[in-house]
Amino acid sequence: MIVFDTGALVALERRKQRALHVWATARRDRTDVVVPGIVIAEWWRERSDAREKVLSSIVVEPVGDRLGRIAGEAIAATSGATVVDAVVMALAAQLGAVVFTSDVDDLEALRAFFPAVRVLAI
């Protein structure tokens, strides 16, 4: 399973080569690409065919109480962490997934709280 952050969705929408490769490989291998719902709020600005295509090919997970609490604890334990990044990492930890991001440094800082999560550049 793969989790994308906002930067990964932007890269996919802009048709960046690595993002397209990861996405196409996941689809070929029937691997779910998952994002927490809060990532959609950060990414979506208006409807476009490119965004609709991306959105139709991913799984959007709601941010419930449990995930929110874990993300909040990660924010408290990690200086400079954002809510969206913490939720992305918490979801990846919960799913046993790899995170693809354009902001490796930001998410690597959260690995102190989520040491089992692999963070890869998109």
Can you annotate each of these PLM segments?
Residues V59-T78:
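Acidic catalytic patch
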Residues E52-L55, L107-F114:
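Short loop/helix-cap segments at secondary-structure boundaries that form the rim of catalytic
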